[in-house]
């Protein structure tokens, strides 16, 4: 069975959560919100969790995605944030 593509699994508009993992720094959560607001306007209440040693910070943010292109662009742009290791 071929692997399903993300666009085939989602029906737009839909709720979508991004999880951004990066080096623990004070501005990471603010940088994530700025990037998300550029492509998906709204008020956001991101959640963050520090790694056990405090080296990394993960920021989860929920959006209402209007189309697959918006999701794809956000994956790319969030990954460009300074110190980001991965975007899930």
UniProtKB/Swiss-Prot annotation:
<dbReference type="InterPro" id="IPR027471">
    <property type="entry name" value="YbeD-like_sf"/>
</dbReference>
<dbReference type="Pfam" id="PF04359">
    <property type="entry name" value="DUF493"/>
</dbReference>
<comment type="similarity">
    <text>Belongs to the UPF0250 family.</text>
</comment>
<dbReference type="InterPro" id="IPR007454">
    <property type="entry name" value="UPF0250_YbeD-like"/>
</dbReference>
<dbReference type="GO" id="GO:0005829">
    <property type="term" value="C:cytosol"/>
</dbReference>
<protein>
    <recommendedName>
        <fullName>UPF0250 protein PM1928</fullName>
    </recommendedName>
</protein>
């Amino acid at each position: 069975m071929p692997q399903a593509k993300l666009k085939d699994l989602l029906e737009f508009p839909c709720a979508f959560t991004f999880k951004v993992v990066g080096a623990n720094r004070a501005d990471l959560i603010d940088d994530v919100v700025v990037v998300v607001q550029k492509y998906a306007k709204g008020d956001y209440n991101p959640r963050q969790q520090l790694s056990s040693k405090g080296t990394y910070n993960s920021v989860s943010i929920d959006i209402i995605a209007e189309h697959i292109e918006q999701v794809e662009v956000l994956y790319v742009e969030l990954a460009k944030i300074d110190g980001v290791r991965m975007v899930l």
